[in-house]
Amino acid sequence: MNTISGEFESGTIVPLLAKPVSRTTIFLGKIFAAFLTLLVTYTLLIAYTTLGGLLIYGPQNNLHLLPISLLGSLFSTLIWVAIVLLLGTLFRSSLIAATGALGIWLGTNIIGSIIGVLAGQGWILTYIPGSGNNGSVGGNPLVGTAVSTGTDNIGPNLINYILHPSWDVTYYKIDLTNSTQGTPIWQALNTEPISAIVFTSIVVALSYFVVLIAISWFVFKRAQVTE
């Protein structure tokens, strides 16, 4: 599978567009090819890790949830596919597309952690691509079960919702005023059910995917191609 930026870089975009096929069909074909590639990759990865776990540790619980994990992984990754596709269509460079998406991912994860834990404004991270806000169930982050709200965690959160539908996730920040050296004081901010986290992350992921794909399609439809 070659990306749109790869077609521009290699020059194959010219004969490709010369074929009696619309640009919309070509664009949708690239998206479909990316989806199939992800589906095959994740299926093989999950099958490999599951088989390894069975061979090493014996029978495992909740294997019936593997399709849910696969579906969640696809949802989470498609948003990054859309970002790469948009950057590649805009700049016609695979390098810029890949490094740009990687930079966005690193920025949202690193800066997001600081914003959430220290500033207590982690709710913002729920509405941008990445790992999202960090919360916990059953106590502060040091003793509770960690839960992240972002689009990167749709699969794990779907499984958490199926196994623990009554979970309430609490978000915390470090109280810098009252914390002593080596002993952080965690201040609870707000709580929301795991069902709301799952619903919000899916809606956010789909919204970004649709908008980014629409922009990419618009740019590709109007791109000037010269031999």
Predicted regions: what is each one?
Residues 11, 57-58, 191:
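Short loop/turn hinge sites at secondary-structure boundaries
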Residues 15, 46-50, 222:
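Hydrophobic alpha-helical segments at protein termini of multi-pass membrane proteins
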